[in-house]
Amino acid sequence: MIRKAFVMQVNPDAHEEYQRRHNPIWPELEAVLKSHGAHNYAIYLDKARNLLFAMVEIESEERWNAVASTDVCQRWWKYMTDVMPANPDNSPVSSELQEVFYLP
């Protein structure tokens, strides 16, 4: 498994709405993530800084990257643009984090 972590932002007034939209996520999005090899996906909120920290275990970079081109992912990104900063393609603005420590 490949461990990935990344940071996103959430609008200051949208913390509760962001959480509501993820509990639960759309069943078809969950199915796409799982079918593309995503496991143990978690997102944490830093309320003081309006930051989201996400971590996920993936089976391959290629399969993970392919999620972005699915119809359900494109619809999800558009659905989330009013609660978080987005790129021109509606993907969330994010920064990948470098792993510096891991305790198995």
UniProtKB/Swiss-Prot annotation:
Identify the metabolic or biological route this protein is part of: Carbohydrate metabolism; L-rhamnose metabolism
> What reaction does this catalyse?
alpha-L-rhamnose = beta-L-rhamnose
MF GO annotations:
L-rhamnose mutarotase activity; protein homodimerization activity; racemase and epimerase activity, acting on carbohydrates and derivatives
Pfam families this protein is in?
A: rhaM
* Record's keyword annotation contains Transmembrane: no
Q: Which InterPro entries match?
A: Dimeric_a/b-barrel (IPR011008), L-rhamnose_mutarotase (IPR013448), Rham/fucose_mutarotase (IPR008000)
Q: Which domain of life is it from?
A: Bacteria
Q: What is its EC number?
A: 5.1.3.32
- Record: active site: H22
Q: Which GO terms describe its biological process?
A: rhamnose catabolic process
Please tell me, according to the UniProt entry, what happens when changing Y18F.
Loss of mutarotase activity
Q: Does the keyword Isomerase apply?
A: yes
Keywords from UniProt, A to Z, are: Carbohydrate metabolism, Cytoplasm, Isomerase, Rhamnose metabolism
**Where in the cell does this protein reside?**
Cytoplasm
Q: Which positions does UniProt annotate for substrate binding?
A: Y18, Y41, W76, W77
Q: Under the cellular component aspect of Gene Ontology, which terms does the record hold?
A: cytoplasm
The family database entries (NCBIfam families) matched by this protein are listed as: YiiL_rotase
Q: What does this protein do?
A: Involved in the anomeric conversion of L-rhamnose.
Q: How does it assemble?
A: Homodimer.
Family from the record: Belongs to the rhamnose mutarotase family.
What is the name of the protein in this document? L-rhamnose mutarotase
Q: What is the lineage of its organism?
A: Bacteria, Pseudomonadati, Pseudomonadota, Gammaproteobacteria, Enterobacterales
Chain's gene name: rhaM
